[in-house]
Structures are given as C-alpha cells and as structure tokens.
Amino acid sequence: MAALSSGSSAEGASLFNGDMEPEPPPPVLGACYAGSGGGDPAIPEEVWNIKQMIKLTQEHIEALLDKFGGEHNPPSIYLEAYEEYTSKLDALQQREQQLLESMGNGTDFSVSSSASTDTVASSSSSSLSVAPSSLSVYQNPTDMSRNNPKSPQKPIVRVFLPNKQRTVVPARCGVTVRDSLKKALMMRGLIPECCAVYRIQDGEKKPIGWDTDISWLTGEELHVEVLENVPLTTHNFVRKTFFTLAFCDFCRKLLFQGFRCQTCGYKFHQRCSTEVPLMCVNYDQLDLLFVSKFFEHHPISQEETTLGETTPASGSYPSVPPSDSVGPPILPSPSPSKSIPIPQPFRPADEDHRNQFGQRDRSSSAPNVHINTIEPVNIDDLIRDQGVRGEGGSTAGLSATPPASLPGSLTNVKALQKSPGPQRERKSSSSSEDRNRMKTLGRRDSSDDWEIPDGQITVGQRIGSGSFGTVYKGKWHGDVAVKMLNVTAPTPQQLQAFKNEVGVLRKTRHVNILLFMGYSTKPQLAIVTQWCEGSSLYHHLHIIETKFEMIKLIDIARQTAQGMDYLHAKSIIHRDLKSNNIFLHEDLTVKIGDFGLATVKSRWSGSHQFEQLSGSILWMAPEVIRMQDKNPYSFQSDVYAFGIVLYELMTGQLPYSNINNRDQIIFMVGRGYLSPDLSKVRSNCPKAMKRLMAECLKKKRDERPLFPQILASIELLARSLPKIHRSASEPSLNRAGFQTEDFSLYACASPKTPIQAGGYGGFPVH
C-alpha cells in the first residue's frame, strides 16, 4: 500500500510540478465564474485547482482499473487504494460543489468550509504529494461581505431532443445522463436505448455514454437523436366506442368510449390523452436490434455457458442481474468509461446432462398443475392493479396451506377441513337424520374419499415419461391416465402436503381442464385423470405439422386462456404450461393437463420444502430461471409460458430455433438478453394478437397482463375476425346430402311452354 501510494504521489507531483504544468482556467470558465458572484478573483483559481485535482484522481483510478481490473480476485492492496481514491474524489467533488454554491449566493464561505478544505488538503498531501496551498482558501471574509448577495445560479445542461424539442436539466453531481433525461424521454414516448446523446466540442458532435456524470457537462449543450434503424412513426388516432370488454393502456381501467391508434393499437380515455406517448415505437424490431448489437459486442464464451455439475447445499443460484440491466455486473466506478468486469457464469441446479436439448419428453395426459398457496385476496388485488374487476364468489376453503408450514402443524390441517358446506350443516337441526346427513356430506367432501385403494386400478401400457413421473394408460371404471410420481418412501410431511394439494385439485371442474379423478398412495404416489384420446398441441405443431387456419389457432388460444383463467381463479399456478401439456380432442377442444404437484417438484430437506428449477426452459420466465426469489412462480410466470405457446401457434415453430446450445439459452434468457423473434409470425396474424404476445413476453414480471384481461382481448379479437357465411342460394337438397343418382330414379320430362302465336295454335278454334 505504501509503495502504491508513493508511486501515485510521485506521478501526481510530476503532473503538477514537472512535465504537465496546470493550464490556466479557460476563458469560458473564468467568464462564467466572474459573472456569477463578482467576489475575490482567487475563487475561480481555486475551483480550477480542484478540477485539476479531480482529474488527476480519476486518472489514478483509471490506472488502477487498467492494471487490476481484469483479475477476478484482485489483491487487497488494490481494493484499499481503490476505496481511498474514490473517497478522496467524493471529498473533492463536495468541495467543488460548495465553492460553486457559495459563488452563486455571494455569501461568506471560507469559515464554514475551512474544516472540509483542511481535510481535503491533508488527504491529498498524504497520497498525492500535492501542496496544501493548492486547496487553501484564498477568500477574505471582509471582501465577500462588501458584495451584494445575488440569487444563486444553479448548474444546468441544455438538451435538444428529437422533433425540434428541447429541455433543461439540472447538473447534479452523481447523477448520470440517463437518469437526468429519462423522464423527458418517457414523456415523449422514447427510451434511452433507442437514442444516442452527443456533446458539441469544437463545432463537432461527439457521442458520449448514457452513464456519464451529468455534472461534468455543466453549461454544455447536448443533442439527443434517435438511432437510424429504430422505426418511429406518428400516431393515427380515431375515436372508438368499445362495445366489448376493453381497458385503457395507461390507467388500466375499463374503457367504453375513447381513442385508439390505428398503427400501434394504443387505446386510452380522453382524460388520459396527456399521458399518451408522442410517437409510435416498434418495440419488436427494437428488441431484435438490441440483441444483434449485444451479440456483436458481447460474444458468449463457452466458459460462461457451462453448467455446474453440483449445486450448493442451500439450493440457491448465483446472482443474476435483473432483466432490464445490460452487460455483466461491474464494480461501481466514478469513471464512466472504465469498469471492472466480474464474470459470473449462470449455473442452474440439478440438470440432467444426459438429456440433450433436442430430446423432449413425450406428452402425457396427466395434469401438471402446482398448487401454490396464494391467499384468495391476492388474485383480486392483482386483477385490480391490472384494471380488471374480477367477479365471483370467495375461494375460501379452496386454498391449501403453504407446504413449507405444513409439517407438524395440526391447526393447519384442521383449517383445511373447514368448508362452507359443513359449517352450514352445523347450524341446522340436531336431529339424528340431519346429523347422519352431515356425516355423509363430510365423508364425501374429505380428501380421503378420493383415494383409490390398491388393486382397483389396472395399469396398462406405458405412454411416456415426464420430469417428475411416468404416465400409463389404465383401467378404472373406464380408460384413465395414471401418472406414477417419482417419490419413493414419502415422509409423513410429504404425504400430508400431497393430500392437502389433492384437496384443491379435486374441486377443479372445467371444460378446458383435464378431469381429476383420484389418487393412490400404494404401492407409490400416483394421480388418476381422465384419458384424452387426442394428441398434444406440440405433436400437432412440431411433429405432424398440422396446418390450422388462423381462426382455429385463435380459438385454441382462447380455450387455453379460458382454462388458465379458471385455474388462477382457484389460486392454482400451473408452473409447467407448454404445448406438450395442452391436448386437443378430435373436435379441437382444448384440455390443459400434466399436473405435477409441489410435493414432487420441490426438494425436501427433513421437514422443510425448497423450490427448485422445474419445467422446460423454452417456456420458463426469466425470473423463474434466475430463481432469486424464494418462490419465483406466480400468475405472471404462467402468462409468460402462455406467451411462448402463442408464439408456437402464430409461427409454427419453437423459439430460439437458431440456438442449439441449451445452456446458452438459459444464460441469455435468465439475464434478459434474449427474447423470441416476433418477426417470424405468420403474415396473416392479426396485429392485436401480435401485441398481446409481446405483452405476455415482457421481461419484467409486473408488466405482464393477467388472464382475465388476456381472455377478454382474445375474445374481442375472435369476434372481430371476418367470417365467410354459407351462400343462401345453395340448393337445400345438396345440403341434405342427396346425390345425383337419387334424382335419376324419378326422372321425368319437364313441360315446355307453347311458343306459337297467341298461345293457342295447338288447339282448334270454333
């Protein structure tokens, strides 16, 4: 540390006293200071000296970064020097700010700031060998008292925005250009990522980074320009009355009469017109532009995409930055152009390396819905936030107790057995008949009644295997699907959690959900559902490549959204929604299946339950891949998976088909660098469906819509599509199915009209 400080001090002394003599203040800076306070002429000189000290300190920090920045584990002496220089830089910047404010106020500042000046001077002399006189106070209090106080002049930066607009932002220390201009750009429908910022130097525009400190640009003029290959258009608003369920894109409230842009589809109330973005931005092409630029400047090496063979005992994952961050994580640095890259490879846990990316599990007809215990009020709160007023009865009694709190909790088990039915029966008469009927109802409502004894199910051929079990075709009062779960010798806690989740599954009844018929615990845990004769949506789209019409594809999406809306209304999170788990009957009726319970999908340690990565990576939301939260699965994670299903429907192919590396997909999607390419959708795909797909695939979880709003949008789209009706002039006999030979049996000559004059030529006239 001493050697490093002495070397830095020698370099600083040579910069100030040797080869690089500090230049006098520039005329612009001196004129600005002279006109601001009119005080002692030594003040601008001191400010100039402090600026030179700041510049010198930054050069030392940059030298340290160039020397040790590329090392994963830099020496401790480097970290100590780094902290010392950054703290010194903060002190110098604070002193500069005090001088500028004092010059603007025209008040006495030498006494109040002498302590800070001495501190800066002493710290500078200890490490940089700079004379304390360079930071000494030259101001005479009596001279300042003779000047009349003037209003302070705040440091500002003038900014010229696109479309001949301009604004002024304050030049605050420690605030980046991005943060200073973010609000002004958002009000104009722009984001920093689609623009470039320039500064004017010597009559030429020179680009600067968005992370540059705005205080370094005090008094300058910045120009913000839209990137060349970012498509921007103006809105095309029309007044519209929405006779079907619609929501304002700004306030998310119900919309009946308002306006709609014919280009981008933005709809809003008249009172929300002031908040509408001024430009139409094609965010789909914008995402593609960012991804292409990222691959150009940030190639992914093999080391970054390598999966770890083992996982930590805690089940946690390495930290991954949020999806809206760009670039690898870096140490904070005061220099905008230097950073310390610290590569952190993303290593998901418990991956089976034997399964290659190209090998996919066969579809099974067993449902795979995770019962994630969410309070009934949460779905209402989320729907209210999205502007949807949900209706329906309370779901009390349908929510299971959180699996993590189940073991050893007798009160939780009792609370689960409470339901509105038995409570009403207890209020009835105490006669023996009522009591017997109450017992009958209670027996029928208990989860034990859904347990199928061992030996009643005849297990047939093996259909396929999934991530957490194997599916067989069986016989139990008809054809059923039996999914044997991969749980051997379950503990009492696991068994109780499994029964609690079954208590919720047994109450699911919907036309678009596979019917749950029962479960068994011997010889192993298994769930029994109805048998589906049709094939999965994955089989139709990617195996036999069935060519569906657009109206059929939209109807499949509508039924899927309808089934998911029902599950979410029951506080059930699917967790593994994908085209393999969506089944189509011969009449194209959608059935959502593949229930994989939380008891099976979670990792148990003793009596405690931990979440683990489950499902197929192509349908996983970024927050699920990162696994930073204790329970990343939510209604919005199902919405993201539904967005991938929409992508399959509208393109006929899987996302990221151009990337063959499974680990690279996990890495890129988890960090928010990769999104499905929406430019591959079919040419006849409606714009509303494409917008809905983009909203469902938002990288930020809270920005995705919920299924009530999704279902309303798809139903509106389905009703708006043109339909070809049967011609009214078609012969009714052909519609009845008669053939040509049916008429030949009754063939007869058709009468002809007489054509002779008068019409009576064939008859004698008397």
UniProtKB/Swiss-Prot annotation:
Residues 1-36, 104-128, 303-373, 386-454 are annotated as: Disordered. The keyword Membrane applies. ATP binds at residues 463-471, 483. Binds 2 Zn(2+) ions per subunit. Residues 457-717 form the Protein kinase domain. Zn(2+) 2 binds at residues 248, 251, 269, 272. Its main location: nucleus. Residues 303-313 have a biased composition (Polar residues). Residues 1-15, 110-128, 314-328 have a biased composition (Low complexity). The modification Phosphothreonine is found at residue 753. Residues 155-227 form the RBD domain. The active site is at 576 (proton acceptor). Expressed preferentially in neural tissue. GO terms for biological process: MAPK cascade. Zn(2+) 1 binds at residues 235, 261, 264, 280. One of its GO terms (cellular component) is cytosol. This is Serine/threonine-protein kinase B-raf. The gene is BRAF.
